[in-house]
Amino acid sequence: VAVDSNAADRQQVVVVTGGGAGIGAAIAEAVARTGAYVVTVDPGVTVDGLARDVAPAETTADRIVAAGGAARPSNASVTDATAVDALFTGLVDEFGGLDAVINVAGISRPTGFDQGDEDAWTSVLSVHVDGYLNVLRSALPIMTAAGRGRILGVTSGSGWRPANAGAYSCAKRAVAALTWQLGKVAPAGVTVNALSPIAATRMVTSGLRSQNQAGGSQNQAGGSQNQAGGISLAIAAMPSPEQLGPVGAYLGSDAFSWSSGNIIFSNGSELAPVLPPRLLEAARITDVAALAHVLDTVIPAAFVPAEAAQATNGASNSRFAGVFDETAPTAEPATSGARSCLVVTDDPRWESALCNALASRGVKCVGIGAAAPATDFAGVSAQLGQAARDAGGIDAVVVARAGTRSGSSGAGEAWEQVLEEHAGITDAIRSDVAWVRAGSAHAGASGRRMRIATVTDATTSGGKSRAQAAAQLSRAAHLVAEVHADAFAIGVETDADSRYSTVGELVGYLVGADDTGGLSGAELVATTEWIGLRSHPYPEASISFGGPELPSWVDATLRGIVNDSSESSRA
């Protein structure tokens, strides 16, 4: 593909996926007002993606042209990699370049932590994660050749706040994780950022009404009416999609070229950078006299309060000066920990390490037999149920399933390796979801409180995104199922053989010790030298400007916040 690197000599070309309605349409129209040629990509399906939508009397492209701009529609789907690639290369052939892609495409299906069938979960993950990866794989080579380009993805507060949004929440956390990683290694002259919007879109209203219908079926008519009224008020309080147009156009333009790898929340009248997870606590695990004793001491005194406050309680008098050299005292048996734990893994080394650590805390280790761990919802439920019957009941599940690891070949640039390492991520996320949901459902049905832990290989970029999706899933489990289950997520960021024993001890603590619920929903991490606790993503500061147009001072103010944050993270 012949790319014209001198964009100043031609009209800017911007693609907006999901540009047929809602926020995508608003951004497309705002971009067109800057003089760019806009291509709106929308397959014209209903919000759940299951059927053709009623064709509008006037498309977004029609409105742009009627207003004096230049645009055309495309009915390609982001899930069709061939179609996306053909669209982008065709635009380069026609115009000489592709200057920006703003990826707003998405669908919504009724899913929650414990709701939604496998098809619904698969469809949502496919559009939001695989679809965005298709866009990136097609756009980045073009922009790399040109030496310039802007990519703006879309995540959601449901992906970084505690939310019972099911597949949508996991997908948007994966998009956030991908943005934070890819943006830092983007090709020279190319930026990758994401918008985290809130608006009364058809996707939001559909999701809220689906939740109302699911809850209302279990209530009296009056209660259902009250719920409906509350949802109407919630929707009425949200900004309209049109309010987000100028913000999206700005974030996807050269004016924002100073930023890459950042997520900006906006409601059309405010901007707030969303910080990635940051380390709150770390505890040494090498050359210690008794690792289990270190965990028993440090986690309840440091990790649990840090998770609750999202801040360390350190930086004062020494908390654990001698604990790393102390031998373990005679342990009192746990009274509220699990007694029987199902270990789900396709790696015999994990099985051995986990079972040894569990046994040291008096927890019986249960396997799934000779069969490979299931990955589909029905198969997982069947395997868990059979294991529970064979063992006479279980009250913990640990999932340390590698599956097919998406490592990098080592060839190509850093951004190419990031994309390569995300191959198969939606299948991995769906498998994790299947086991965590099945464990929670079993707890609810059996009346036995359950502890559920996921152990994720986070040594690759795709593994890090999977680990963050698992952390978001554990937050949803804590939010929805805390009455009968605690959920823990551990990202393993080392390939060293020592990881088996050290992470095994950490899992042993979470499953077998008394009262570990204070870390339910937390994001735990293990390296070769230490185990740690990370913060949840959060907005660092907010700029209020009234909207929807951005005053001239907003750019410099936002730049100051983001740059201060970046300097702080490097310090």
Predicted segment positions?
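Canonical Rossmann dinucleotide-binding motif of NAD(H)/NADP(H)-dependent dehydrogenases/reductases
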Residues: 6-39, 331-365
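Conserved Rossmann-fold SDR core element
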Residues: 70, 97-99, 176-179, 185-202, ...
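Substrate-binding pocket helix/loop in short-chain dehydrogenase/reductase
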Residues: 112-113, 117-122, 408-424
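C-terminal helical subdomain
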Residues: 213-216, 223-318, 495-571
